[in-house]
């Protein structure tokens, strides 16, 4: 099967003079289901549509956007697998100098606010052709949202981009129905109420059975109204009971239909059976780091019911787990093993959270009226069926393939869930670690983990004890590398000191700490901007200055010479100078240097891996 056309000559080789849908993408074109635009393009192609891809066009002129001509139906624009601002800037708002989704890892192949810029250029090139926007950037900016890089509330991206329709979430259903209806002659302006979409109406337009949340103007001027808008919208994310949401922007209305229904197992299997080339487009002469990272990985499912407050998965993929069948996964492994570059190691079998594969709610009636954002917090839902047999069978099958030497589970596990999955836990420790297990407690102080919607210290200690005991029993020299966040809303300098002392007591040391980044669409970002917990209304302490955020981070890195001055300053502020000798010595440690991925809950190589790069060889991550 050939690549999706990217040039006129590739179109002509297929005998095509015009395409039905043209995708414009901020990432390089890698024909693999781990990348959203190629997945949707192949999905439409399967259903008889002629599609093309314009990857990373030069936005400084209009000509690159005209490369494939005028589509018969519409353009579909996406910033790529990450929000373009997250991709371009560090948590300190400093410009990055690399881009894993670009050949040669080069920065600068897409603009800031790429969805907005692409839409503007497409409208300039073909004013009368509809432009549909989607992807993580559009999804998480679909309502009025706080923008960290401008430190203000911005309008829905649909208004700023002046697009015709916004598709949010995993868009296979909405994209296909839109193309089919337009293909039958319907005007996009007449297609309203399609699940998983947002559109604009004039004020006064009559809508039934909807929820109106505080308007853009209120959100921009009143932080409590912003928190209220977030709280109301986040409770409508269950596709079975979510209502249409309306948010006024001046004299117009943003209308957001309920989320798309989840895919059934057979539909998931059919997606991953599409004829992908499983390679970057041959026009690229340099390697694409994101492709190198995932080319030996397998997506087993999508969705996550953890509901971490700093993570965007729930607002994008949803909390309902959509799993592939084992035979579908086995078919992909069989294909992978035949690749000439495959060397025997599968780098990952998983999703956003690997040990959620095959899990579901045990009460369909309860599920369809549920408004919980997490099935695990504040305590595990009594309706959740936690059965690890299906996941264990999948891992066994993967290891048994001829030509497979090792299977990693590097997309992360929830260690609180592992307490009810003893067989899976044993499998993980015995066969799928290979040296270091990266775990993501994010914090260990209860008042902070509660705000993060994460398990607390006691749960982590039980997991750590079990991991060490099982590793010793197996004679495996395995260790733990903890992932931690500094500067999270509600976290004070004293909390970070308490965390640092807990790590010392547990014999753990970190080499990288993630400074909290307020990314659009998350609960933690709402906390950061509003200064309150949107669920309880409790006022929160929020570290906003670069100085304090730097001090929080330094308290966990006292063994590094470059952080010594900041550690001493932090201890002086807390009146705890006597702890200097404790924090400024290396101490016992299981950890080695492990670079943390540069986003929390935003970067996505594919449906199922929200954190993308920097995992050392032979390492896995647990949440």
Curated annotation (Swiss-Prot):
For binding [4Fe-4S] cluster, which residues are annotated in this chain's numbering?
A: 304, 308, 311
Query: Which GO terms label this protein's molecular function in UniProt?
Result: 4 iron, 4 sulfur cluster binding; catalytic activity; iron ion binding
Name the PROSITE patterns on file: RADICAL_SAM
Q: Please provide the record's keywords in A-Z order.
A: 4Fe-4S, Iron, Iron-sulfur, Metal-binding, S-adenosyl-L-methionine
The record's cofactor note says:
Binds 1 [4Fe-4S] cluster. The cluster is coordinated with 3 cysteines and an exchangeable S-adenosyl-L-methionine.
Region entry Disordered, spans: 594-623
Sequence ranges assigned to domain Radical SAM core in this UniProt record: 290-560
Kindly list the cofactors needed. Answer: [4Fe-4S] cluster
State the family it belongs to. Answer: Belongs to the UPF0313 family.
What protein name is recorded for this chain?
Answer: UPF0313 protein Ppro_0556
Please tell me the species this chain comes from.
Pelobacter propionicus (strain DSM 2379 / NBRC 103807 / OttBd1)
